[in-house]
Design a protein with these regions (language model features):
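A generic hydrophobic-helix recognition signal that picks specific residues
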Residues: 3-5, 34, 107
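Aromatic-lined, polymer-binding surfaces characteristic
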Residues: 37, 44, 48-53, 58-66, ...
Length: 161
C-alpha cells in the first residue's frame, strides 16, 4: 500500500506540472541555483501548492503524505544490517527504505515548511552517510542510497549549513 501511494503521489504531482515549456532544458543560472532541482522546480512546486483546496485527490494524497511523514518522525534511523548479520553484504532493502523516507520527509518539509520534518531527514541522511560503505560490489545498493541522499539534499535546499 505504501508503494502505490507514493507512486500515485508522484504521478499526480508531476502530471500537473508538465507542459511543453517545462520540457525544455533549463539553462538559466538563476533557475539552476534554486532548490529543488531534482524531479521538479520551485515554480512547479508552487503550481502544485496553488492546486491545494481545488483538487480533492491531491488534497487526499497530501494528507496521506503528511500522515506518513508524521509516522516516520518516531521511527529510528535504519541500522546497517551488516553489523548484525555475518556474511551479508546486501543493504538494498535499507537503501530502498531510505529513498522512501527521504521522499516522504523532504516533501512534507517542502509542502508544510515544518522544521521537524527537515530535522528528521537530516538525521537520516547523516546516519546513512556514516555507514562504512553502501555495498559498492552491488551497484543497485549504491544507486538507491545515492538517490535517497541526492533527493534529501536537494529537496531540503538551504536547510544544510
Amino acid at each position: 500500500m505504501r508503494l502505490i501511494n507514493l507512486v500515485g503521489l508522484f504521478f499526480l504531482l508531476f502530471s500537473f506540472t508538465m507542459t511543453g515549456r517545462n520540457l525544455l532544458v533549463r539553462q538559466s543560472g538563476k533557475e539552476l541555483r534554486q532548490h529543488p532541482r531534482l524531479l521538479f522546480s520551485k515554480q512547479e512546486e508552487q503550481r502544485i501548492r496553488d492546486l491545494f483546496g481545488t483538487e480533492p485527490l491531491l488534497d487526499s494524497l497530501r494528507a496521506s503524505l503528511m500522515k506518513e511523514a508524521e509516522r516516520l518522525l518516531a521511527v529510528p534511523p535504519q541500522e546497517d544490517p551488516r553489523r548484525k548479520i555475518k556474511n551479508t553484504k546486501d543493504i538494498l532493502s535499507v537503501s530502498r527504505e531510505q529513498v522512501y523516507r527521504m521522499v516522504n520527509l523532504a516533501l512534507a518539509y517542502r509542502l508544510s515548511g515544518e522544521r521537524r520534518f527537515a530535522e528528521k531527514a537530516e538525521k537520516e541522511l547523516v546516519h546513512v552517510c556514516n555507514f562504512s560503505d553502501w555495498d559498492p560490489i552491488h551497484y543497485l545498493d549504491v544507486a538507491e542510497m545515492t538517490t535517497a541522499v541526492a533527493i534529501g539534499y536537494d529537496w531540503l535546499g538551504g536547510w544544510f549549513g
